[in-house]
């Protein structure tokens, strides 16, 4: 669900700028959630996605994404749904997502957890980008060495 961050202007993940009050999008095929960003808030979504809106005083979007993507309690509930699914392609539907329960700590703790999750994802993608840059520089050096002999 998460894509490589290119620039602040192309922040499709919402890592730099989330759209406060806009909620999240759930990919029903991959069973992954991502907060809406300023860049994605007005985009049309297909039937493979579900747009979720919620009261920001009760549920933090990044906390929701953390619970949906990484939480064991969510995973157990989603796996129960998959066990009854005989399709070769496992896909969530609106009804199954609506039946999933979430345990909510107070909003301050949600915001803290959501903020840490957001930062961890940002760090991961920055590190992946750095590793790609190092690999590309190494390959370019090897090509130049190859030309010299």
Where are these regions (language model features)?
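Amphipathic alpha-helical segments
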Residues: 61-65, 93-132
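Sequence-specific dsDNA recognition surfaces
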Residues: 1-21
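Charge-rich amphipathic alpha-helical interaction elements
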Residues: 7, 12-13, 51, 140-143, ...
């Amino acid at each position: 669900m998460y894509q490589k961050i290119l620039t602040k202007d192309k922040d499709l993940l919402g890592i730099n700028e989330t759209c406060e009050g806009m909620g999240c999008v759930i990919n029903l095929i991959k069973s992954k959630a991502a907060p809406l960003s300023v860049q994605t808030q007005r985009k049309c979504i297909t039937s493979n996605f579900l747009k979720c809106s919620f009261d920001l005083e009760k549920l933090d979007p990044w906390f929701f994404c953390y619970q949906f993507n990484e939480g064991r309690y969510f995973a157990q509930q989603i796996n129960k749904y998959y066990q009854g699914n005989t399709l070769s392609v496992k896909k969530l539907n609106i009804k199954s997502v609506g039946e999933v329960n979430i345990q909510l700590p107070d909003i301050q703790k949600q915001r803290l957890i959501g903020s840490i999750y957001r930062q961890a994802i940002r760090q991961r993608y920055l590190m992946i980008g750095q590793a790609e840059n190092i690999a590309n520089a190494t390959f370019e050096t090897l090509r130049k060495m190859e030309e010299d002999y």
